[in-house]
Swiss-Prot record:
Gene3D superfamilies membership: 3.30.230.10, GHMP kinase, C-terminal domain (3.30.70.890)
Molecular-function GO terms, alphabetical: 4-(cytidine 5'-diphospho)-2-C-methyl-D-erythritol kinase activity; ATP binding
Native organism taxonomy: Bacteria, Pseudomonadati, Pseudomonadota, Alphaproteobacteria, Hyphomicrobiales
Protein name: 4-diphosphocytidyl-2-C-methyl-D-erythritol kinase
Organism per entry: Bradyrhizobium diazoefficiens (strain JCM 10833 / BCRC 13528 / IAM 13628 / NBRC 14792 / USDA 110)
Active site residues per record: 14, 141
Catalytic activity: 4-CDP-2-C-methyl-D-erythritol + ATP = 4-CDP-2-C-methyl-D-erythritol 2-phosphate + ADP + H(+)
């Protein structure tokens, strides 16, 4: 019998269009409310079925991935193997193009891609409770990345409500400075059981636009919320402020803010040509930065 062909999945970049921190729970985790979209830039994960679990990493940003044992692809696969008896495994190959520790869920998207590949190989549903539990145990952003579709995300990241986003022209910029999520939450400074000031307005999230709403409709509502991690992240890495300034000064920009815990920032535009023109200017002005022009959806 011929060997099973390789399976391929993309790990699309996650972008937090808004991110409100409700507070820090007694167990130390933070309750969040976030509108999450996904970009058209992605890592690529391949699975060669059969044999023991392996991971090889290549690509322009492979060196930033660190040790294989610490990679979330490896962690997710091992946890699923513990949860599902006789799980078929294989050799993963990761083509890494997204920045690491960048606020766009690159590692989480890769882990989610690994779970989707293993689900395909083992005829598991993405709604399988074992897979869902493993996704959350791997990382707070992995559940939303598992489905890779726009959602209103609450709790620590496990409560997902699908949203109908229009295709939004965007520019994403990372200054090639890693920012550790734990450091940003530490800088936020909430004690266990403490609510963020103003959090009462977060608990009842805005009424998000319905299917068919325009980019302008979404921008209008998104302007009423924010990313509560932006200020503490900028205290850690002030260059984030420079990135936001470059985006906000670009022609045609509708909204610009930081994604996740940084340092990647994004801007939304009314037309693809505006996004591409803005990206070209930022590349010229800041040749050391990572810049992507594309769409969010």
């Amino acid at each position: 019998m011929s060997p099973m062909p390789a399976l391929i999945e993309e790990g699309r970049a996650k972008v937090n269009l808004s991110l409100r921190v409700v507070g820090r729970r007694a167990d130390g985790y933070h309750d969040l409310e976030s509108v999450v979209a996904f970009a058209d830039c992605a890592d690529r994960l391949t699975l060669e079925p059969g044999g023991e679990l392996k991971l090889a990493t290549t690509g322009p940003l492979a060196a930033a991935c660190g040790d294989t044992a610490d990679n979330l692809v490896f962690k997710a696969a091992k946890l699923l193997a513990e949860a599902v008896p006789n799980l078929k495994l294989g050799a993963f190959a990761l083509d890494k193009v997204l920045p690491v520790a960048a606020g766009i869920g690159g590692g989480s998207a890769d882990a989610a891609a690994a779970l989707r590949l293993l689900a395909r190989l083992n005829n598991l549903s993405l709604d399988d409770p074992r897979l869902q539990k493993v996704a959350l145990a791997t990382g707070a952003d992995v559940p939303v990345c598992l489905y890779s579709r726009a959602c209103d995300m609450t709790g620590v990241g496990e409560q997902l409500l699908p949203l109908a986003l229009p295709s939004m022209p965007c520019v994403m910029v990372n200054p090639r400075v890693p920012v550790a999520t734990k450091d940003v939450f530490q800088a936020l400074g909430l004690r266990n059981g403490e609510l963020l000031v103003g959090a009462t307005s977060v608990i009842g999230a805005p009424a998000w636009p319905e299917e068919g709403a325009s980019i302008a409709d979404w921008v209008e509502v998104l302007e009423t919320v924010a990313n509560d991690l932006e200020a503490p992240a900028m205290r850690i890495e002030p260059v984030i402020g420079e990135v936001l300034e470059a985006l906000r000064d670009s022609a045609g920009v509708k909204l610009a803010r930081m994604s996740g815990s940084g340092a990647t920032c994004f801007a939304i535009y009314g037309a693809p040509a505006e996004a591409h023109a803005a990206a070209e200017k930022i590349r010229r002005d800041h040749p050391g930065w990572w810049v992507h022009a594309g769409t969010l959806s």
